[in-house]
Amino acid sequence: MKNQYVPVITLDGPSASGKGTIARLVSQALGFHYLDSGALYRLVALAAMKRGVDAGDEQGVVGIARSLDVSFADSSIRLDGIDVSDEIRAEACGEYASKIAQYSALRVELLERQRDLRKLPGLVADGRDMGSVIFPDATLKIYLTANEEERARRRHKQLMEKGINASIAHLVLALRERDERDSKRVASPLQQCEDTRLLDTTGLNIDQVVGKVLGMYADSGSIE
């Protein structure tokens, strides 16, 4: 495994479980690099949508990924030199990304891009297969989850802050459908591995969850 001596914390879990926010804050607390794997798939989705490639066109989508010009710097995510940090968070982009994430060829194409981000002093990576596929030798693997209602409320809050209206009932159904699609896909399905620690964040605030993750990392014996 490339750079196997560099510590890695993986946070996997379903959509709206809070893994992105928690991973970013944990990386800041430890001074580690941060990998938002979902952003890579959303970037492919956005690029494909802009070029009129249908989500059902696997070869077309993989071709887009192969020539993807992206950069992560200064808290911004850039596609072809343009900041698309907000654009990739749109629901339509997320739905497209969820559909194309089932393609084995696409996951292979993005595999090394993700592993190349494993650099000193360490990495915190969030996604759905970070601990099971991308970094199976991670120092600490956590499966982050929350009940459907809590996740729907979090997603609703995110959308409202962006001026996007959505009903919680609709979001519950959308999350349920996405969970089923993510867990049943053939390529790297969403699952909790045997060596992954479960962290249910239902009823917990952000600081509490970050504290628990940092505590787990300290307990792993990786902090000297």
Swiss-Prot record:
Any one annotated GO CC term: cytoplasm
Enzyme class: transferase
Compartments reported by the entry: Cytoplasm
Classification via Pfam families: Cytidylate_kin
Residues at which ATP binds: G13, P14, S15, A16, S17, G18, K19, G20, T21
GO biological process, alphabetically ordered: pyrimidine nucleotide metabolic process
An example molecular function term from Gene Ontology annotations: dCMP kinase activity
Chain coiled-coil ranges: none
Catalysed reaction equations from the record: CMP + ATP = CDP + ADP; dCMP + ATP = dCDP + ADP
Alphabetically ordered keywords of this record: ATP-binding, Cytoplasm, Kinase, Nucleotide-binding, Transferase
Family annotation (InterPro entries): Cytidylate_kin, Cytidylate_kinase_dom, P-loop_NTPase
EC code(s) of this entry: 2.7.4.25
Family per similarity comment: Belongs to the cytidylate kinase family. Type 1 subfamily.
This protein's name: Cytidylate kinase
